[in-house]
């Protein structure tokens, strides 16, 4: 059985790009819709990526899969909506941003020693596309990076908070 990374698709325009980048690392990936997340982790799945979305976690009908069987068992990467969903789910605060960010931004890494930023240069150019922003991180998470416009550009679970790390961008 081939090990893989599961990509949970919330309807982002770039989910296929995420899968391609994972494949370029010679890692098999599979994209599934957010509502098809298995209740138990399949033995061949070694990590989970939560994609972005055109929707907001603040919406009454926000897309909210149950991650309880997954958190702490395998590494999780939240991207855009995925990052906002993780923050919201664990008690953080997400709000509509008064500084909508779309396009290139410079990343200010606040914790360069964190393994998530291994090989990433200070001031790296990144792509941002979102209308919501994370105002407050949940307990058990730490801020890793910001941009000039957005105070929470990357964050992660604190070491030991979960058995397996959650990182979000």
Language-model-derived ranges and their functions:
Residues 63-79, 84-169:
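Pocket-forming structural segment of enzyme catalytic cores
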Residues 2-7, 12-79, 84, 90:
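Flexible gly/pro-rich beta->alpha loop and the following alpha-helix that scaffold active-site loops
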């Amino acid at each position: 059985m081939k090990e893989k990374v599961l990509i949970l698709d919330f309807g982002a325009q770039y989910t296929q790009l995420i899968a391609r980048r994972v494949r370029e690392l010679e890692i098999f990936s599979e994209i599934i819709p957010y509502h098809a997340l298995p209740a138990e982790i399949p033995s061949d799945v070694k990590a989970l990526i939560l994609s972005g979305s055109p929707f907001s976690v603040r919406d009454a009908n926000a897309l909210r899969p149950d991650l309880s069987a997954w958190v702490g068992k395998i590494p999780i990467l939240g991207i855009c909506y995925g990052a906002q969903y993780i923050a919201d789910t664990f008690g953080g605060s997400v709000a509509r941003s008064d500084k909508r960010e779309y396009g290139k931004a410079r990343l200010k890494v606040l914790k360069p020693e964190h393994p998530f930023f291994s090989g990433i240069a200070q001031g790296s150019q990144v792509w941002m596309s979102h209308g919501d922003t994370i105002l407050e991180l949940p307990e058990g998470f730490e801020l890793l990076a910001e941009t000039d416009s957005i105070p929470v550009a990357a964050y992660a679970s604190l070491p030991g908070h979960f058995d397996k790390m959650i990182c979000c961008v």
